[in-house]
Structure formats: structure tokens, C-alpha cells
């Protein structure tokens, strides 16, 4: 009887803690945003993890994933969510712990539409955000994560903008369900974006380590992106950087929109970017 009572109490406590986390997140999302110039200072040298969400998603896209990443981690990683507006303004929400060496910055865009033309615009907006972050924190190295089209934005940034940031090195990039050949099902049917990525592959940083996560939810893809489109990333990265690896995630939680919160994916993120 005691064991049953204790088990029930534990379940109730877990539900209550989950409720508190959800409530805290809702409150955080409703807090007013601040101009990017008001970003708090750090008391330590940082190597941030900078994340880019996919099309139609906002800077809040990774809230649940970061909660899972922080579970059991001491201390927790700070989460700063930055939004780049079409008029070049930048605002942020979140709190930076003064001694957090690996804070998480998420950069979202007002223009979060799909299509190669918009992806190039988003890469320019991301570059502007990187300039502001470097001016504020003077970091020389960072790691990145891109979900879906966020991985494409990162690819454009690496090939077109990174070299302009003197003394900056990108150590690792983790992409999740990134469609390097957009909606095509055959690698032989290359879209102009993939052609550009392959043409400019020599501009990729040679020291970069890349982990590409592919979801198999239904037949040959994650329900949104075809397997071959994600695998086309090897045409861009393999042999041009320090390492390129692909990991396949299967099952009910391998749908395109579920992948960032997938427990296996969270473990891979923790191992690859936080390890």
C-alpha cells in the first residue's frame, strides 16, 4: 500500500513539475521583447550554440527541445531568442546567465517563408545577427543547429558570409531534416539551390564537423522531406570538411515537425553539441 501511495505521489509530482515548466514557458513567451542593444553582458568567454528554425517557425521553435536538453543538466544553458525583422530591427527575449559558457541563441526571422529566394534573404539576416552577437560577446568559435530550412540558411551562411567574420570558426553543425534538394525525390533532378551549394562547396570551412539527422516516418521520408533530399547534403559537405555523418531516426516520433523534440535526437544534440 505504501509503495502504491509513493508511486502515485511521484506521478502527481511529475505532472505538477511539468505544469510549472509549461506555465513558466507561457509567461516567458508573453514577456515584452527588448532591443538587441540591451543584451546582457557575460562575465566569461563564451562558445555559443546558435540555432536556426525552419520555414514558418519562429524563434520559439526550440523551447521544448531546450527544456529537454537542460533536463538533468547542471547548470542549465541560457536560452536567448532573437528575432530579426524585415526592417533590420532585432529584438530578443530571454535571460543570459553571467557565467554560462555555452548559452543557446535562437535566431528567427519575420520573413520565415519557404523558397530559395527567401532562404538567401534569411542568411543575410542571420549574418546581421551574428555581427551584433560578435560585437557584444567577442567569441571566436561557435556551434550551430538548423532544423529543416534552417540547415539551408546555415549552408548559405557558411559559403557566403562566414569568411567575412575575421577570426571566427564554426566548430560543429547539426542539421535536422534539412532538404538540400528541396521537394525533389531524385538526386539527379537537382534544384538550382543544390547546384549552387555544390558549386560553392570549396568555400565551406575545412575544420567543420557536420552531423545530418534524417527522419523516416513514412516510407521514404519524414512525412514532409524526402529521404534523398536530406541525403543530398553529402554532395555538399562530404570530403570538403573535417567530417560529415548521417544518422537515421525511425518511428512515430520521426515526423518532420517532431524531430527536434525526439528523445533520440535530443540525445544526439547533447552528445554532439554539448559534449
Please describe what each predicted stretch is.
Residues 10-11:
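Polybasic, lysine-rich low-complexity intrinsically disordered segments
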Residues 19-145, 152-275:
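Lipid deacylating catalytic domains
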Amino acid at each position: 500500500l505504501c509503495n502504491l501511495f509513493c508511486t502515485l505521489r511521484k506521478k502527481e509530482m511529475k505532472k505538477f513539475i511539468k505544469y510549472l515548466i509549461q506555465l513558466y514557458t507561457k509567461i516567458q513567451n508573453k514577456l515584452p521583447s527588448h532591443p538587441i542593444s540591451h543584451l546582457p553582458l557575460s562575465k566569461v568567454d563564451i562558445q555559443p550554440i546558435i540555432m536556426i528554425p525552419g520555414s514558418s517557425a519562429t524563434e520559439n521553435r526550440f523551447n521544448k527541445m531546450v527544456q529537454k536538453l537542460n533536463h538533468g543538466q547542471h547548470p542549465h544553458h541560457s536560452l536567448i531568442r532573437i528575432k530579426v525583422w524585415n526592417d533590420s530591427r532585432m529584438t530578443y527575449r530571454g535571460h543570459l546567465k553571467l557565467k554560462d559558457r555555452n548559452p543557446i541563441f535562437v535566431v528567427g526571422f519575420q520573413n520565415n517563408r519557404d523558397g530559395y529566394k527567401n532562404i538567401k534573404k534569411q542568411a543575410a539576416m542571420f549574418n546581421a545577427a551574428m555581427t551584433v552577437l560578435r560585437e557584444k560577446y567577442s567569441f571566436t568559435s561557435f556551434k550551430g543547429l538548423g532544423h529543416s530550412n534552417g540547415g539551408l540558411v546555415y549552408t548559405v551562411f557558411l559559403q557566403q558570409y562566414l569568411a567575412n567574420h575575421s577570426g571566427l570558426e564554426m566548430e560543429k553543425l547539426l542539421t535536422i531534416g534539412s532538404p538540400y534538394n528541396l521537394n525533389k525525390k531524385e538526386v539527379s533532378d537537382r534544384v538550382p539551390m543544390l547546384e549552387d551549394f555544390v558549386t560553392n562547396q570549396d568555400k565551406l570551412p575545412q575544420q567543420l564537423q557536420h552531423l545530418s539527422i534524417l527522419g523516416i516516418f513514412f516510407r521514404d521520408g519524414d512525412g514532409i522531406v524526402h529521404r534523398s533530399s536530406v541525403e543530398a547534403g553529402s554532395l555538399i559537405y562530404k570530403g570538403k570538411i573535417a567530417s560529415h555523418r548521417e544518422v537515421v531516426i525511425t518511428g512515430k516520433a520521426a515526423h518532420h515537425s517532431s524531430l527536434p523534440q525526439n528523445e533520440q535526437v535530443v540525445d544526439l544534440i547533447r552528445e554532439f553539441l554539448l559534449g
